[in-house]
Curated annotation (Swiss-Prot):
Residues 736-818, 849-929 form the ACT domain. Its EC number is 2.7.7.59, 3.1.4.-. Residues 1-379 are annotated as: Uridylyltransferase. Pfam families: ACT, GlnD_UR_UTase, HD, NTP_transf_2. It comes from Rhodopseudomonas palustris (strain ATCC BAA-98 / CGA009). This is Bifunctional uridylyltransferase/uridylyl-removing enzyme. Transmembrane segments: none annotated. NCBIfam families: PRK05092.1 (NF003467), UTase_glnD (TIGR01693).
């Protein structure tokens, strides 16, 4: 509740502006409306000039906190000038009564003395008693002028009694009053509020307040994304953002009665180094937030992809080999978020310890306090004790005495299900210099680490090791990818968080019981017992070489060959880890972009995986990896593709033997389907089953088969030759359009063009043909609306467009051109994806495989299929997928005579045309002969 202090280099001249106001008042004597209009115009000009100067200064010195202080100081000055203008020139009362007093107070974020350029202003008008005509008029002048300036103002008018009463009942109001700051008016009235608030509201309610604030924090994180490593973070409300720092300060103000952030160190809340970290984090986050507001010219707090590069450049980041400027900036951002998390953990643990909590449950509720439990020794070690159900050091120098304890403490906490005592956490972070080459090579330290990795609850323990800095010091290659962001729309987390989540996925696979992982859960029980640790190591390390100029799979295998002998792995096991890392993308690529019914696909994949044991391990790694990319990325469709690839390949590797051969799997899939339709007549079931080729029964999951059957039956009973069904996949944030039509070579192109003309972006396509010549295509399009009702109406419009095109009522080229002229999304424009086209005859004996990769855009699939047809090629099958901003589409084609494309000159012409299309949006080549 301290008064605002101007930044040292502040140049706002209040005296000059006050003189101009006096001149305006004299000029407009007797015309209050004209004076108020002129007053607002003057203030608007002054504020605009001050903001321009603040932005220029921020670009020069990059001090975010100083910029926020400067903007706040200017706003303070404007409000004081408005208050003075209202009370001196408009509603002057030479002898005010006791009720004609008012205090103008800043609250909320503004009350902290820090403002982002487009932030709202929260004001509290405090009165001694009830509202008076004079008070209402003065408040009205201030508010209307601020609104005329273009500011968003939240406001309330209350007496001191009302403030106290409402603060007791409402935690939001209590927090707002906690952060009030005097601006103008009667200081005695403000002093009364402060004194009564401390005595009548704060005293004896610390536990209640802390519990409420931490519960709010958890809910805020849930809304904005639980992980602090989400790649489009919310700088204000996200985990590790400014609001977390604010929560720390609120709690400290309430519990320790500090007034200024500098007192956090004086009161022992943080040690001097931790307070310097607090200030450094705060300054960086304010720099980012202020720059976002200046760039967008709105109160935007999400650091979205289309902003990240520009903000990074404004903050002075440059590209280095293997890392773009934007990736270096975001790595720094996530390192800061990690440090904010550490500060939060330290304060929360300190509070809980002081309150002698039985478990770290402040984030859930601060229940009744009880006396501290007696310290007792941790089993298996004399160096650590259990202190209030937290692991702590028996003596201060346990790490210096034996550096292996820096690893051992995490293993003991894991085995005994203990949280960390704040003193232990601090000691760990202060002892990182003890993690030397000698400790990294220590057999006991490495044995303990492998135990951590392969034991229950490895994910949270590894995350704690990462957040304290131990993991990155102990495995230096891991340290290089800590907080590393990949600048793309596919990965939802930083590299280190992705790897740790993948370990958690592996443990969930091993526990079993989740149908998402049915195949992998079955396989993990069948791998050799001595390969279990190999699998865990491969999962933890598979992306460890991200950010290097060399391909990360190849470079990661080299890291594994250096690292795994440290872990006690044999030469053979080390090579197996390296192989898994080197091949970790192969199974996903083949499953999603190759024709799994083509014998050559299976033979080629079998040649890569070599043995059933290696294929089992690669299947499990692939499953854990895909699920760790982000919410909804792993789904039933991909699970079915992986399952099909596995079981199609198994007989090739075993010389014809398979635990479940192909014919049996087809029969089992059909039996499973039949069991879902007991109400159908047997003849109808037999006829329907016969309509689908074997690949359909192997590649499509049961729920989709059921939907297809009901859709086909209803459409045909209604006499529809063309029908469209709409479904929603919330996990993937897509809408599915299933289209039933008479099959013909241009059908996919027509559907893609219809979607493009309707503004729908295709992210996936599953294409099947029935034995009676009907096409059954499921197209997944990006979801545009949150509510299913709105999305359903949009999908219906898209379906109508598809029908109009297929019925010849709408010409596609013109419709697509009209939609394309509206431009693509800004988020996609933030990315650069080099176009790539590969033409290969080795993946099929019958078809030429064309694989294209480039920046996704509305209408791309239509453009590609149209161009391929114009190149006199027939598309036999297509495998369509998007990975964030990158489209990767694979087409199995022949020439018009049904032969592969073997002539090098023709292959080169096809490649030139498609590369040009990917880069420029049109095909430059004429049809090839």
């Amino acid at each position: 509740m301290s008064p605002s202090r101007p930044a040292a280099d502040e140049r706002f001249d209040s005296a000059r502006v006050a003189a101009e106001i006096a001149t305006l008042a004299e000029k407009h004597t007797g015309n209050d409306a004209a004076f108020r209009t002129a007053l607002a115009m003057l203030m608007k000009a002054e504020l605009a000039k001050a903001r321009t100067e603040a932005e220029a200064q921020l670009l020069r010195d990059r001090h975010g906190r100083r910029c926020a202080e400067r903007l706040c100081y200017v706003q303070d000055a404007i409000i004081r000038l408005l208050f003075n203008a209202a009370t001196e020139y408009l509603y002057n009362t030479p002898t005010p009564s006791s009720s004609e007093r008012m205090t103008v107070v800043a609250t909320g974020g503004y009350g902290r003395g820090l403002m982002a350029p487009e932030s709202d202003i929260d004001l509290l008008f405090i009165l001694p008693y009830k509202q008076t005509a004079w008070g209402e008029q003065v408040a009205e002048v201030i508010l209307y002028c601020l609104w005329d300036i273009g500011l968003k103002v939240g406001h309330a008018t209350r007496s001191v009694d009302e403030c106290i009463r409402q603060a007791r009942a409402d935690m939001t109001i209590r927090t707002a009053i906690l952060e009030t700051r005097f601006l103008a008016g009667d200081e005695a009235l403000y002093a009364e509020l402060v004194e009564r608030f401390d005595k009548e509201v704060v005293e004896g309610t610390a536990a209640e307040f802390v519990a409420a604030k931490l519960a709010e924090r958890e809910e805020r994180h849930r809304r904005s994304g639980q992980s602090r490593y989400l790649v489009e973070p919310n700088v204000k409300d996200g985990k590790g953002g400014l609001r977390d720092l604010h929560t720390l300060f609120w709690i400290a103000k309430y519990v320790y009665r500090v007034r200024e952030a500098s007192e956090l160190s004086e009161r022992g809340v943080f040690d001097p180094a931790e307070f310097r970290t607090f200030r450094r984090c705060e300054d960086f986050l304010w720099s980012v937030r202020c720059n976002i507001h200046f760039v967008t010219k709105r109160a935007e707090d999400r650091l979205s992809f289309d902003l990240q590069r520009e903000i990074g450049v404004r903050l002075g980041y440059t590209s280095h080999p293997g890392m773009q400027d934007v990736e270096r900036f975001m790595k720094h951002y996530f390192l800061i978020a990690k440090e904010v998390g550490n500060l939060t953990a330290i304060l929360c643990a300190k509070l809980e310890d002081q309150q002698a909590k039985a478990a770290p449950a402040l984030t859930r509720m601060m229940a009744r306090l009880r006396p501290a439990a007696k310290r007792r020794r941790v089993p298996e070690s004399d160096d650590f004790v259990i202190d209030n159900n937290r692991i702590n050091l028996a003596v201060p120098d346990v790490f210096k005495h034996d550096p292996v304890n820096l690893i051992r403490i995490f293993r003991l906490a894991q085995k005994n299900n203990l949280a960390f005592h704040p003193d232990a956490m601090r000691s760990v972070t202060r002892s990182l210099s003890l993690i030397t080459p000698q400790l990294r090579d220590n057999p006991e330290a490495n044995r303990l680490f492998v135990e951590i990795l392969t034991s229950d609850n490895a994910e949270p323990v590894l995350r704690r090791m990462n957040e304290t800095g131990v993991l990155g010091r102990f495995i230096r290659a891991f340290g290089r990818i800590v907080s590393m962001m990949q600048f793309n729309m596919y990965h939802s987390y930083t590299v280190d968080e992705h790897l740790i989540r993948c370990v958690g996925n592996l443990q969930e696979i091993e526990r079993g019981g989740n149908d998402e992982f049915a195949l992998s859960s079955e396989l993990i029980r069948k791998i050799r017992p001595d390969h279990r640790a190999v699998l865990y190591a491969a999962v933890l390390l598979h992306d460890i070489a991200k950010g290097q100029p060399e391909d990360h799979s190849t470079a990661g295998a080299k890291v594994a060959r250096r690292l795994c002998p440290r872990f006690g792995f044999s030469t053979a096991d080390t090579e197996l880890v390296a192989w898994l890392i080197e091949k970790h993308l192969v199974m996903s690529t083949v499953a999603q972009s190759r024709d799994l019914s083509d014998r050559k696909t299976i033979e080629n994949f079998a040649a890569v995986v070599e043995t059933v044991e290696q294929m089992k391990m690669l299947t499990i790694l692939t499953t854990a990896d895909i699920r760790g990319v982000g919410p909804g990325v792993w789904n039933g469709w991909k699970a079915q593709l992986i399952r099909t690839l596995y079981y199609e390949t198994e007989p090739v590797l075993t010389g014809g033997f398979s635990e479940v051969n192909r014919a049996e799997r087809i029969r089992a899939a059909q039996a499973e389907f039949r069991a879902a339709f007991t109400e159908w007549p047997e003849a109808d079931l037999n006829a329907y089953v016969a309509r689908h080729y074997p690949a359909y029964w192997l590649k499509v999951d049961l729920q989709r088969k059921i939907r297809h059957a009901r859709f086909l039956r209803a459409s045909e009973q209604a006499g529809h030759k063309l029908a469209i069904n709409v479904g929603f996949d919330e996990a993937r944030a897509v809408t599915e359009l299933t289209i039933l039509a008479v099959d013909h070579p241009w059908l996919l192109s027509v559907i893609a063009g219809a979607c493009a003309s309707a503004g729908a972006n295709i992210v996936d396509a599953q294409i099947y043909t029935t034995t009676d010549g009907r096409a059954l295509d499921t197209i997944s399009i990006s979801r545009e609306y949150d509510r299913d009702e709105d999305e359903g109406r949009r999908a219906t419009r898209i379906g109508e467009t598809i029908e109009e095109v297929l019925e010849g009522k709408l010409r596609l080229p013109e419709a697509v051109a009209r939609r394309a002229s509206s431009g693509s999304k800004a988020k996609l424009r933030a990315f650069v994806v080099e176009p790539e086209v590969e033409i290969n005859n080795n993946w099929s004996d019958r078809y030429t495989v064309i694989e294209v990769s480039g920046l996704d855009r509305p209408g791309l699939l239509y453009q590609l299929t149209t161009a391929i047809s114009k190149l006199n090629l027939n598309i036999a099958s297509a495998h369509v997928a998007t990975f964030g901003e990158r489209a990767r589409d694979v087409f199995y084609v022949t020439d018009l005579l049904g032969a592969q494309i073997t002539a090098p000159t023709r292959q080169a012409a096809i490649k030139r045309a498609l590369v040009h299309l990917l880069a420029n949006g049109d095909a430059a080549e004429k049809p090839a002969a």
